[in-house]
């Protein structure tokens, strides 16, 4: 079965639409939103519904309130920001279920927007509880999921809720996410290059194993590279290594090589005597990492190697930074890779693992073909998994 999208629903006019969005945005200590990409990403879907004078009921979680009310995790800042972006009032409901919410939804006028309070104030959300899902669905006519970033979670507002709606669809953000995933993984223009970074191999091994059936080249940077390098016999000093995964890393490396995949690892790195922005640093080759020092970024020769490997790429998928880019001394490798990816002639898809943050910080946002809003969801798609939120959309898309 295929997913039905909101623009394939024949009659939205004045209907009450329950829209699952992901407004899990970062806040500062004064409850101000510091980055609103996730809110802006669903504006096309909300505006499309409003063009049909629909009544839009938005539902999201924020943070981890652990199944109980906590003012710190209120959706109020998100409702306020959305109101500004839409140029119209977004009413914040006092709860996400209950009589008070039902009254608000029943009294909505065509073109009204209501934001429900944090879904995770109830344990039923993360337990995928049917009763909680039914309570959410009450009083609405159509279900729309436009929260790709939580679609790998079998939660009540993502999965169970679809049982209680006659019409189930996805929004335009979801459409973009699925479209770019298919362009990069299902029908890629080759050569297809995967860049994987970040601290740990453990979160990426399944991704790597799945990618080995699809890609032409793999580039490994970040802390995870040093588990591979140690497995290959290099002395990596105090660099981050997952000792329990050395054998698995070596097997994955050998398997990729057997399949004819070009497998790139760092040839030099920026090392420090301690994990500290003020640490003493120097550039060394991989063969000469001093005892007691740790590698915290890729070096200039590696940047050249990786950039050259990208030159003939037609599709690039990137997840995870090349070093501890939050510290200025170890940010150059990641920013150089952002530049190499942004200035390539390939279709470029970036997702999760702080890679999107690095792209924003480097000011190259506009040159990337697509930046995924999903961290864990993006990774699970790369692993070849069926996401619960996507599966129910496929199963119920044309019921």
Swiss-Prot record:
<feature type="binding site">
    <location>
        <position position="120"/>
    </location>
    <ligand>
        <name>substrate</name>
    </ligand>
</feature>
<feature type="binding site">
    <location>
        <position position="38"/>
    </location>
    <ligand>
        <name>substrate</name>
    </ligand>
</feature>
<dbReference type="GO" id="GO:0005829">
    <property type="term" value="C:cytosol"/>
</dbReference>
<comment type="similarity">
    <text>Belongs to the phosphoglycerate kinase family.</text>
</comment>
<dbReference type="Pfam" id="PF00162">
    <property type="entry name" value="PGK"/>
</dbReference>
<feature type="binding site">
    <location>
        <begin position="352"/>
        <end position="355"/>
    </location>
    <ligand>
        <name>ATP</name>
    </ligand>
</feature>
<dbReference type="GO" id="GO:0006096">
    <property type="term" value="P:glycolytic process"/>
</dbReference>
<feature type="binding site">
    <location>
        <position position="204"/>
    </location>
    <ligand>
        <name>ATP</name>
    </ligand>
</feature>
<keyword id="KW-0808">Transferase</keyword>
<feature type="binding site">
    <location>
        <position position="326"/>
    </location>
    <ligand>
        <name>ATP</name>
    </ligand>
</feature>
<keyword id="KW-0067">ATP-binding</keyword>
<keyword id="KW-0324">Glycolysis</keyword>
<comment type="pathway">
    <text>Carbohydrate degradation; glycolysis; pyruvate from D-glyceraldehyde 3-phosphate: step 2/5.</text>
</comment>
<dbReference type="InterPro" id="IPR015824">
    <property type="entry name" value="Phosphoglycerate_kinase_N"/>
</dbReference>
<dbReference type="GO" id="GO:0043531">
    <property type="term" value="F:ADP binding"/>
</dbReference>
<feature type="binding site">
    <location>
        <begin position="22"/>
        <end position="24"/>
    </location>
    <ligand>
        <name>substrate</name>
    </ligand>
</feature>
<dbReference type="InterPro" id="IPR036043">
    <property type="entry name" value="Phosphoglycerate_kinase_sf"/>
</dbReference>
<feature type="binding site">
    <location>
        <position position="153"/>
    </location>
    <ligand>
        <name>substrate</name>
    </ligand>
</feature>
<dbReference type="InterPro" id="IPR001576">
    <property type="entry name" value="Phosphoglycerate_kinase"/>
</dbReference>
<dbReference type="GO" id="GO:0005524">
    <property type="term" value="F:ATP binding"/>
</dbReference>
<dbReference type="GO" id="GO:0004618">
    <property type="term" value="F:phosphoglycerate kinase activity"/>
</dbReference>
<keyword id="KW-0963">Cytoplasm</keyword>
<dbReference type="GO" id="GO:0006094">
    <property type="term" value="P:gluconeogenesis"/>
</dbReference>
<keyword id="KW-0547">Nucleotide-binding</keyword>
<keyword id="KW-0418">Kinase</keyword>
<comment type="subunit">
    <text>Monomer.</text>
</comment>
<protein>
    <recommendedName>
        <fullName>Phosphoglycerate kinase</fullName>
        <ecNumber>2.7.2.3</ecNumber>
    </recommendedName>
</protein>
<feature type="binding site">
    <location>
        <begin position="61"/>
        <end position="64"/>
    </location>
    <ligand>
        <name>substrate</name>
    </ligand>
</feature>
